[in-house]
Each structure stands twice: as C-alpha cells, then as structure tokens.
C-alpha cells in the first residue's frame, strides 16, 4: 500500500493549452502543483519512462489518410518522421521545466543549441534531431528491436 501511495505522489502530468500550437505553453507538472482554472488545458498522465534512443526522448509523426468512414478506408504512409528532444532525458525534478528534454516538437527544439539539422539529405541522419523511419528501423534492429513487430 505504501509503495502505491509513493508511486501516486510521484505521478507527473503533461498540460497542453487547448488553443495553442508549436509547443507553446506545454508544462510537465507534479501531482501537487497548483494550476490556474482560468486557463484551458488538456491534461494527460506523463509517460515518465519512455523508450529512448541514445538517451533521448522521441516521438513519431505518422501520416494517415482516412478517405471514408463508411466503409472505413484508412491509408497509412510507409514513412514518417522521428522527432527528437535535444537534451538527454532526465526525470530530475529540477529538469521538469526544461523544454528541450521533455518536448519533441520541431518548433521547440530547432531553437536549441544542440539541434542538428540533416538538411533533408538523409546523410548523417542518425546524428540529427529528425530521422526518417528508415533510420529508425536501422536503430531498432541494431538494438535488437523488431521494427516490423512494433509497427504490425
């Protein structure tokens, strides 16, 4: 019971303003943080232990077309973007406000001194802040992760 209570007190939430974009106004907060009720936020439990690549948090931009709802017809493009945070991941409470650790938005991370642009050439992609799914497949396979299983 005490373990569960301690775990509940360590829960983090991510707050996203409902009328914003490009990573503006996003906050990672603890359970006891007070927030203004005047501002509209979408709150979600924060994934505190995400899968990391080389110590960096990342997300996937997947392109999907829904051309019909009845009958349902969905097309998923076979490539997409892997967007990285530009500072190594940390759950240290002193780092919760560091946007370059917790956010993967391109519009946020392009302002980081650690941002690495691959200039769209695909060369040196694995050391850049944005990858193709081809580079992700390579990284997964080098680490014993089945790309096909993940995307099945």
Description of each model-found segment:
Residues 4-152:
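Catalytic core of tubulin tyrosine ligase-like
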């Amino acid at each position: 019971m005490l373990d569960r209570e301690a775990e509940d007190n360590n829960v983090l939430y991510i707050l996203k303003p409902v009328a914003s974009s490009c990573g503006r106004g996003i906050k990672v907060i603890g359970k006891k943080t007070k927030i203004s009720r005047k501002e509209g936020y979408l709150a979600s439990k924060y994934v505190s232990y995400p899968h990391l690549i080389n110590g960096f948090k990342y997300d996937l931009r997947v392109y999907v077309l829904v051309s019909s709802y009845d009958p349902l017809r969905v097309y998923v493009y076979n490539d997409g973007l892997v967007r990285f945070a530009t500072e190594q991941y940390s759950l240290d409470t002193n780092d919760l406000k560091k946007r370059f650790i917790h956010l993967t938005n391109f519009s946020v991370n392009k302002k980081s001194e650690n941002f690495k642009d691959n200039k769209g050439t695909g060369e040196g992609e694995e050391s850049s802040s944005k990858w193709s799914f081809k580079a992700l497949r390579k990284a997964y396979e080098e680490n014993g992760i089945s790309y096909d299983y993940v995307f099945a």
